Amino acid sequence: MGVIVNAKQFTEQFWNLTCDRLGAPYTIQYYDFTSSMMHNSGLFIMKIFAVITKDAAVAMNLTYLSIFFIAGIISYFVMRNIKINCWVASLSSAVFALSPYMLFRNIGHIVLTECYFVPLSILLCIWIYERDDVLTLDKDFFKRKINYVALFFTFLIANNGIAYYPFFTCFILMVTAVSKLAKTGKIKQGLRGVVAVIMVCFFVVLSILPGKIYNIMNGSNAAAVDRSGFEQTELYGLKIAQLFMPLNGHGWYDKYIDIYNENAFLVTENSSAYLGILGMIGFIVLMFCLFTKRDSLLKKRLACLSELNISMVLLGTIGGLGSMFAFFVSPMLRAYNRISIFIEYVSILAVALLVNELIRVIKDNKKVVSAWAKRISLVLTGCIFGLMCLFSIWEGYPQLATPAYDTNKMNYISDKNFVENIENSVEAGSMIYHEYPEYGPVNDMWDYHLYIGYLHSKTLKWSYGSIKGRDEDKWNKNVGSMPIDKMVSYLKEQGFAGIYIDRRAYEEEELTTLEGSLKQILNEEPMISDNENLSFFKF
């Protein structure tokens, strides 16, 4: 629901950090939520779709669907940059773009589904590992075009993934810097990774600067974002077993998946860490590459990926480096299992490199006299790899519950008609009070259900949406605690036009009492939606 709210805001205003139609009688300021300022790339894409379509629902859906295309295209660019065959790059990028991680996160966690810049993070590491001209601090720094490209990458990375992806990128850049320093013994070489980290951090600070200024002017608000402590990093840490465990077994091994999920400890969102068939093969290959000679470009490149891979496992795993960081430094990042998408990409990239090398060997093999034999070998290689990729996509596809499309459509139309009727019955720009201001699901009312009024209206202002810990939240709690007769009198004095009730939030007896009291006080029957989920009492 929060995604479509952003889309709605983009159809009515420039950006999404304020909203004068929520939190009435106040204006909502979202500057307390740092995460709202740390996925600007996805919001920018949504803004484009919102401006073009003028429809929040369409803009939201197009934004979601575009993720898979953008992820595939960027991955293809990265693989072609390191000279991987075009069709190998295409197939491998398709596997990444349709990864179990992204499909599982879905639109509900779209800020994490938008992991299309992960390949750029890996490419930065490869450039620093292999090239001596990238981000080298010397007099020719601004003469090399590659540095501008690298800096642009850091800008994109910093504005994606609500702190997680920038943090993971900084980690692997530091791993690359240490590796480069250890291999060359030159501080200058290690500093190139540090420069990249500094630039990512610079752009992150730049993106959250409006929030920091707001906090300085209005005071900090610890209540807005709850982080209980370092122990949550254990709850949401990475489990190596789940890198190899699908979300579903397509009827083949569901029994074993269920046994693990029902009996193992700490099975949470980390179940989305599954690498897929191609990713698992690459992961195992990279583990072996830790111990191989590095006497060719391919082996050196695989060595780079293997170092990144094992380092990311150590960071993400339960009780690993991430837990130590949360305990000793900051617990604000808690779900280190989310590094699994980085692990998946380096694993897929490893397989792509090996297949690419196989193609090169076949083409350069002078022992094969017949050109037809080479062609047949290349065709067979392509077919086998293509089938592997298709099977990996199919096998990794999570069989999530199918939404009740007909019911959702019926409710959507009912909600839309109901809110339009409210808007037609009161003056433009009127304030509407939500009887139930609390956050979180209550009975059959889901979290964010109270956004329905805002989504389907054009000018009405709604009391829902207040930021915890701020004045509007205190006002809402104060009004919500009043006896119903005093509440009605006070709301009339404040200029509200009526009370909106989501009936799903109440037990039957409680709802009957509430609506009965309002009928008696206002001497008026309520408007009721066609699906009977909502009611409205006009003052």
Where are these regions (language model features)?
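Membrane-interface coil-to-helix junctions
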Residues: 1-71, 99-115, 237, 244-265, ...
